[in-house]
Curated annotation (Swiss-Prot):
SUPFAM superfamilies: (Trans)glycosidases, Galactose-binding domain-like. Belongs to the glycosyl hydrolase 35 family. This is Beta-galactosidase 9. The gene is BGAL9. One of its GO terms (biological process) is carbohydrate metabolic process. Pfam families: BetaGal_gal-bd (PF21467), GHD (PF17834), Glyco_hydro_35 (PF01301), SUEL_Lectin (PF02140). Residues 791-877 form the SUEL-type lectin domain. Coiled coil: none annotated. The active site is at residues 194, 263. Its EC number is 3.2.1.23. Ubiquitous, with higher expression levels in siliques. It is found in: Secreted, Extracellular space, Apoplast. Residues 1-30 form the signal peptide. InterPro entries: BetaGal_gal-bd, Galactose-bd-like_sf, GHD, Gly_Hdrlase_35_cat, Glyco_hydro_35_CS, Glycoside_Hdrlase_35, Glycoside_hydrolase_SF, Lectin_gal-bd_dom.
Length: 887
């Protein structure tokens, strides 16, 4: 067996080299397809003269590193996607007016070329407003400083900048020969984004803006169709598309346009202090199947991969650093099972139906019951002969239904769709999950080879490996710290001062307290109070550099008691943003910091109007300005050794060095011991962190897939920290001595920070004899030639570790009537005694395996006349460790 594993490893390396060469060649040649045109009719997009049913995977390139892109694209294709969809992020590409950035995570051309080299198409959503839970909705903050500007309306300054950027992107794609008519992957573009949600706020100017945006886009000569999503008044030559949890009832505003679903929300975003969203795979598959059943032709998962809001890119306010979104690929690019696998099966079933779906101009409708219906597609196939496909739906949320269709009986589980690619046999039902379930395991770091000498730096306690026992600390100054401050009479709006170069803005004023004030307070009780009509997101109030208190909220009234001493006192206000507003009308007016009046109450002679006081302003932190989080500049700061018994302190910088974990599994920092702040590794900004507990109530004990989904249904993680693990991409790590720097705002213990790896360590499969046959069997020559009946094919359990991993052990296997679910299986009354040995022989030491669910596979029938199920629980381990295992 060890020899076979070594052979497998060699074969895998050779295969990887071949794949790399195949990918690299078209990138060099600049051509990915034979040039083709894209048009559309009422039924579908027409690609190279043929109607297509398309599945799209939403991937935002800046939410991953370039080193991750190829794997994400490959897994999307493996999962059945035809298209990748992404926004274009204006504030990432033009952070300073006229200065463009197309490097690193913003190397858009490279991302598009990788998509083309994989054989997938691209839907490029230029916007340039994107929403996307992205900082300021993708708009660069400098845009709001242009005199007279109003965003997203018939406003000349805005239209000028928008046209300039959209033209820049279209020209960039054309110059790189990335449009389909040039042999590239781009088949469709988008202008604006969900403008219909806010259009009424702008009146007639909004309607005029829609017409202008469409005309401007079409005038660029991109040569592919343009769409507008959630735009019922989209002009005739722009396709209006649907966004939402369900779009099977959507109809475009013209009979000449196809039904497109640009955002299928397969999960939801998360706010600090919120629970985690979860959309069941069964409901998501139901929504997609219903969409194609009722005439849809293009559907995109928002998101297929969510990724990470690195740096300060998260929008909000208060959106967390993780953008996992409960997507089919998780934040790190690992498959989320069973969602990824169940959707892969769904896509395969839809592809089997595609000849019939494109042959018919519209489906034939047939009522099967009070809440049951069929849609039948039939016509002439491209290669001759008749084609037929049918979708049987049961929209009853509670009861299964037995229906008759074409003379045959079918059982439809509640809230499900059965897909019949030949109008006779069921290839897939949305409520019957045959895909494996994966359980993500988070493991303490194993030092990489060659780094064993630093093991003494790792502290072990309660089976936790902490990142380091050696930390340095540096106190961030409270208040004005540099010469680049300025003084102004009155309170200024936060963004007008910071230009979003930092989350933080210091305000300082001098408060004079008389002896009479002191006597007045002694006689009348409490001291003075800072009162501000409205503030966002975080306000901290200091008196003479001592923290008086803090307030968190979104445009909430701020009232903070303060205590002064007699004489002159420094009143310091620190405002802080936690992601700029990314959704809504009039974004340019939203701003940050304070609104309304600010006053200081409780003085003997009355309130003090702080709005008219003289204030000194300082943007950002001294540590930020000195770039002490970078490898180049951190040694210039005056760090001191942090004692292990040091008390938590506010406004502290911490640094240490660590070696990366061995292997290729995704790396995370566990920051549960910290309070709130920001983190950097080797100068790369990991993002904001915040150890805030979600509400205790609101999570369902059980998640029922049946019935319409919303973001509050099936949530998880109630009563726990919203986020504790923060992704550190492997490409940002060096072989040893990686610099970790944190800025801690509220107080935490860096000695309990740990570095961990995440992988799909546990796989489970549970499939019964009544399950449908594997989708791949429909494409075998025996079935196509008619020498095999699909009904004679047994279902299978399919187990598949992540790349670079193999099945190291079978923890449980039972063919019969097993009880329980993944990580909790037990043997039932009926059990084939050879289950464990049969499954182990088929799977152990392999990256993936198939086990037939049949008496034949297990040699005999353990309980005649009983419907049997195969349940398996296995573990995956890195393949390089397999040589240490005995078989």
């Amino acid at each position: 067996m060890a020899e076979s594993i070594r052979t497998f490893s060699l074969q895998w390396r050779i295969l990887s080299l071949i794949i790399a060469l195949l990918v690299y060649f078209p990138i060099l040649s600049g051509s990915y397809f034979k040039p083709f045109n894209v048009s559309y009719d009422h039924r579908a997009l027409i690609i190279a003269g043929k109607r297509r049913m398309l599945v799209s995977a939403g991937i935002h390139y800046p939410r991953a590193t370039p080193e991750m892109w190829s794997d994400l694209i490959a897994k999307s294709k493996e999962g059945g996607a035809d298209v990748v969809q992404t926004y274009v992020f204006w504030n990432g590409h033009e952070p300073v007016k006229g200065q463009y950035n197309f490097e690193g995570r913003y190397d858009l051309v490279k991302f598009v070329k990788l998509i083309g080299s994989s054989g997938l198409y691209l839907h490029l959503r230029i916007g340039p407003y994107v929403c996307a839970e992205w900082n300021f909705g993708g708009f660069p903050v400098w845009l709001r400083d242009i005199p007279g500007i109003e965003f997203r309306t018939d406003n000349e300054p805005f239209k000028k900048e928008m046209q300039k950027f959209v033209t820049k992107i279209v020209d960039l794609m054309r110059e790189a020969k990335l449009f389909c008519w040039q042999g590239g992957p781009i088949i469709m573009l988008q202008i604006e984004n969900e403008y219909g949600d806010v259009e009424k706020s702008y009146g007639q100017k909004g309607k005029d803006y829609v017409k202008w945006a469409a005309s401007m886009a079409l005038g660029l000569g991109a040569g592919v169709p343009w769409v507008m999503c959630k735009q019922t008044d989209a002009p005739e030559n722009i396709i209006d598309a649907c966004n939402g949890y369900y779009c099977d009832g959507f109809k475009p505003n013209s009979r000449t346009k196809p039904v497109l679903w640009t955002e299928d929300w397969d999960g939801w975003y998360t706010k600090w202090g919120g629970s985690l969203p979860h959309r069941p795979a069964e409901d998501l598959a139901f929504a997609v199947a219903r969409f194609y059943q009722r005439g849809g032709s293009f559907q995109n998962y928002y998101m297929y991969f969510g990724g990470t809001n690195f740096g300060r890119t998260s929008g909000g306010p208060f959106y967390i650093t993780s953008y996992d979104y409960d997507a089919p690929l998780d934040e790190y690019g690992l498959r989320s099972e069973p969602k990824w696998g169940h959707l892969k099966d769904l896509h395969a079933a839809i592809k089997l139906c595609e000849p019939a779906l494109v042959a018919a101009d519209a489906p034939q409708y047939r009522k099967l019951g009070s809440k049951q219906e069929a849609h039948i597609y039939h016509g002439d196939g491209e290669t001759g002969g008749k084609v037929c496909a049918a979708f049987l739906a049961n929209i009853d949320e509670h009861k299964s239904a037995h229906v008759k269709f074409n003379g045959q009986s079918y059982t439809l589980p509640p809230w499900s769709v059965s897909i019949l690619p030949d109008c006779r046999h069921v290839a897939f039902n949305t409520a019957k999950v045959g895909a494996q379930t994966s359980v993500k395991t988070v493991e303490s770091a194993r030092p990489s080879l060659g780094s064993m000498s630093i093991l003494q730096k790792v502290v072990r306690q309660d089976n936790v490996s902490y990142i380091s026992k050696s930390w340095m600390a540096l106190k961030e100054p409270i208040g004005i710290w540099g010469e680049n401050n300025f003084t102004f009479q009155g309170l200024l709006e936060h963004l007008n001062v910071t230009k979003d170069r930092s989350d933080y803005l210091w305000h300082k004023t001098r408060i004079s307290v008389s002896e009479d004030d002191i006597s007045f307070w002694k006689k009348n009780g409490p001291n003075s109070t800072v009162s501000i009509d409205s503030m966002r997101d975080v306000l901290r109030v200091f008196v003479n550099k001592q923290l008086a208190g803090s307030i968190v909220g979104h445009w909430v009234k701020a009232v903070q008691p303060v205590r002064f001493i007699q004489g002159n006192n420094d009143l310091l206000l620190l405002t802080q943003t936690v992601g700029l507003q990314n959704y809504g009308a009039f974004l340019e007016k939203d701003g940050a910091g304070f609104r309304g009046k600010a006053k200081l109450t409780g003085f003997k002679n009355g309130d003090l109007d702080l709005s008219k006081s003289s204030w000194t302003y300082q943007v950002g932190l001294k540590g930020e300005a000195d770039k002490i989080y970078t490898v180049e500049h951190n040694e210039k700061a005056e760090w001191s050794t942090l004692e292990t018994d040091a008390s938590p302190s506010i406004f502290m910088w911490y640094k240490t060095y660590f070696d990366p974990p061995a292997g290729t599994d995704p790396v995370v920092l566990n920051l549960e011991s910290m309070g709130r702040g920001q983190a950097w590794v080797n100068g790369q900004h990991i993002g904001r962190y915040w150890n805030i507990i979600s509400q205790k109530d609101g999570c369902d004990r059980t998640c029922d897939y049946r019935g319409a989904y919303n973001s509050d249904k099936c949530t998880t993680n109630c009563g726990k920290p919203t986020q504790t693990r923060y992704h550190v991409p492997r490409s940002w790590l060096k072989p040893s001595s990686n610099l970790l720097v944190l800025f801690e705002e509220t107080g935490g213990n860096p000695f309990k920070i740990s570095v961990k790896t995440v992988t799909a360590g546990i796989l489970c499969g549970q499939v019964s004899e009544s399950h449908y046959p594997p989708l791949r069997k429909w494409s075998t020559p025996d079935y196509i030639n008619g020498t095999m009946s699909i009904n004679s094919v047994a279902p299978e359990v399919h187990l598949h570790c992540e790349d670079g991993h193999v099945i190291s052990s079978i923890e449980f296997a039972s063919y019969g009537t097993p009880r329980g679910s993944c990580d909790g299986f037990s043997i039932g009354k009926c059990h084939a005694s050879n289950s464990l040995s049969i499954v182990s022989e088929a799977c152990k030491g392999r990256n993936s395996c198939f086990i037939e669910v049949s008496n034949t596979a297990f040699i005999s029938d353990p309980c005649s006349g009983t419907l049997k199920t195969l349940a398996v629980m296995s573990r995956c381990s890195p393949s390089q460790n397999m040589s240490d295992l005995s078989f």
